[in-house]
């Protein structure tokens, strides 16, 4: 089937002007996730913030109750006993100066990055490489920590990091099309709660303004915010 015809078919039945209750929206998205692979179900929040101002940044991490369905590769910058702890917890890549050199050379073999506090002067050199990818370790989201085992377990077990983009949008994957509707809704409500709690002091007016859900290859479905809040 031609791409244009496929898109037209999957968009059928979606009212672009309507806000759907979350359960109905997820059902519609799942029905239209017809690719041969297990598509990721994603959510996007349009927030009433201007991230150009330091007091309007939104960032955090949340453990989704049903995981993400995705296997993350976790890299840890640590030495000695903490490096051993990271390996025992299942970290995919562990190192210190050697790992910094690999990353500086363009080899990034992880999706999530964790560091012990003493490693940050070294890891700081990687800001231009890891920063744009959203991978820079940060104590505010628990990726600069002495509890490397806990951080690795969290990353492997379904922790989702979120961060507002320039246009005031937070996007995140909250599961797979193979998940039940109930599990996806539970994950969405957990993420929404975390985003709500991360509301910055500088935010004015309505905080969560618009919400939409979609699958990797499918169309977006607008959500009634009241059905995912609280």
Curated annotation (Swiss-Prot):
<comment type="function">
    <text>Protein L1 is also a translational repressor protein, it controls the translation of the L11 operon by binding to its mRNA.</text>
</comment>
<keyword id="KW-0810">Translation regulation</keyword>
<dbReference type="InterPro" id="IPR023673">
    <property type="entry name" value="Ribosomal_uL1_CS"/>
</dbReference>
<dbReference type="InterPro" id="IPR005878">
    <property type="entry name" value="Ribosom_uL1_bac-type"/>
</dbReference>
<comment type="similarity">
    <text>Belongs to the universal ribosomal protein uL1 family.</text>
</comment>
<keyword id="KW-0699">rRNA-binding</keyword>
<keyword id="KW-0678">Repressor</keyword>
<keyword id="KW-0820">tRNA-binding</keyword>
<dbReference type="GO" id="GO:0006412">
    <property type="term" value="P:translation"/>
</dbReference>
<keyword id="KW-0689">Ribosomal protein</keyword>
<dbReference type="GO" id="GO:0019843">
    <property type="term" value="F:rRNA binding"/>
</dbReference>
<dbReference type="GO" id="GO:0003735">
    <property type="term" value="F:structural constituent of ribosome"/>
</dbReference>
<dbReference type="InterPro" id="IPR016095">
    <property type="entry name" value="Ribosomal_uL1_3-a/b-sand"/>
</dbReference>
<dbReference type="GO" id="GO:0022625">
    <property type="term" value="C:cytosolic large ribosomal subunit"/>
</dbReference>
<dbReference type="InterPro" id="IPR028364">
    <property type="entry name" value="Ribosomal_uL1/biogenesis"/>
</dbReference>
<dbReference type="GO" id="GO:0000049">
    <property type="term" value="F:tRNA binding"/>
</dbReference>
<dbReference type="GO" id="GO:0006417">
    <property type="term" value="P:regulation of translation"/>
</dbReference>
<keyword id="KW-0694">RNA-binding</keyword>
<dbReference type="InterPro" id="IPR023674">
    <property type="entry name" value="Ribosomal_uL1-like"/>
</dbReference>
<dbReference type="InterPro" id="IPR002143">
    <property type="entry name" value="Ribosomal_uL1"/>
</dbReference>
<protein>
    <recommendedName>
        <fullName>Large ribosomal subunit protein uL1</fullName>
    </recommendedName>
</protein>
<keyword id="KW-0687">Ribonucleoprotein</keyword>
<comment type="function">
    <text>Binds directly to 23S rRNA. The L1 stalk is quite mobile in the ribosome, and is involved in E site tRNA release.</text>
</comment>
<dbReference type="Pfam" id="PF00687">
    <property type="entry name" value="Ribosomal_L1"/>
</dbReference>
<comment type="subunit">
    <text>Part of the 50S ribosomal subunit.</text>
</comment>
